[in-house]
Structure formats: C-alpha cells, structure tokens
Amino acid sequence: MNNTDTLEKIIRHQKTKDPAYPFREHLLMQLCIRTNKRMQDNISEFLGAYGINHSAYMVLTTLFAAENHCLSPSEISQKLQFTRTNITRITDFLEKAGYVKRTDSREDRRAKKISLTSEGMFFIQRLTLAQSMYLKEIWDYLTHDEQELFEVINKKLLAHFSDASS
C-alpha cells in the first residue's frame, strides 16, 4: 500500500463516521500539501548541491533580471515579499560567497545597493542552465495538457486564497 492509499483510507474512515464529511476536499488538500513538501525538499536538495538555498537563489535571480544587475535591499524585499531582515541575512551570506557586493547608492549616500559580482553572474548562469534541465526532468512526467491544467488550477486557487485574505 502506498502513501496515497494509506491517506485515502484514513480520510475515508472519517467519511464513514460522518457521511457529510468532505472526503474529496480533504484528500485534495492533503495531496497538495504533500506534493508541495516533496517539491520543496527536492528543490532544496538540488540547490543545496550548489551551496545555496531557495531564498538565496531567488535573490540572485532577481538581481540577474534587474537593470545593471543591481537593486536596493528594499527593492529586493518588495519584489520577493521577503522581510528586510531576511534580505540582510541572505545578502550577508551571498556577499561572503563572493556572489554579490554592497555599494553606496549614487542617488542617496545613506542607502546601499546590492549588485551581482562577475562570480555571481557566472554562478547564476551556470545554476540556471542546470536548473533548466532539472525542471524539464521533473515536469516531463506530465503531458503538456496536464501541465497546462495544473497551471490553470493552481493560479485559480492562488487567486482564491489571495481574495480570501484581502
């Protein structure tokens, strides 16, 4: 018996106790949670082989996409919806690794800018290439139509949760 069979058995038991119990909804929620956890663990393992975590990767890709590969900590924080404290911690780590550097802002002497170093540029390009192959490997398991449906459903659910929390 695999994990989903066990999960279904447990939830089905709840349904036998209460016929009105939302079996499918509970099962879907549990499947989403478990799939998300496995994906996060898988991505963490992949990025860990390169010596970084997902948050550091997101900061690097945000800087890579920025004009002149340079942003202020508050711009990064806003784009990624990370706290300023978290951005500082991540930047400290990336600076020690030699991937970013802090510089004084030309517009405001009190402000700092964070920019990719040449080593950081090379690293993110190499990592992006490896990740491209890795992502294809993960998602090739689903057909193109299944991938599109998965995207539509997830966007719809995310919009629902965003509306519900407003």
Where are these regions (language model features)?
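Charged, amphipathic alpha-helical coiled-coil/dimerization segments
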Residues: 92-149
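N-terminal helix-turn-helix DNA-binding core of bacterial DNA-binding proteins
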Residues: 23, 41-82
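Short amphipathic alpha-helical segments with heptad-repeat character
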Residues: 29, 33, 37, 81, ...
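Active-site phosphate/pyrophosphate-handling residues
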Residues: 27, 58, 148
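N-terminal leader segment of winged-helix/HTH proteins
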Residues: 1-50
